[in-house]
């Protein structure tokens, strides 16, 4: 029973990694000439945190776009 459970867990991990390879490969996304998107937005890292980090990095504005924090020059 434990062996079967372990195999099931490993198969789930393998399948999950196959579906997420595109997300991991693109760490920086440019939405326009003035936008730089890098950090993923989550429940704990939302629009306010993104905006704050963009201002700290000397961008004029920032917000979550398509699940990523995008900073505007």
From Swiss-Prot:
GO cellular component, one term: extracellular region
The entry's keywords: Antimicrobial, Disulfide bond, Fungicide, Plant defense, Secreted, Signal
Signal peptide: 1-25
GO biological process: defense response to fungus; killing of cells of another organism
SS bond list: 37-71, 41-64, 50-69, 54-70
Main location: secreted
Record's subcellular location: Secreted
UniProt xrefs under InterPro entries: Defensin-like_dom
Family membership: Belongs to the DEFL family.
Name the UniProt record assigns to this protein: Putative defensin-like protein 57
Naturally occurring in which organism (per UniProt): Arabidopsis thaliana (Mouse-ear cress)
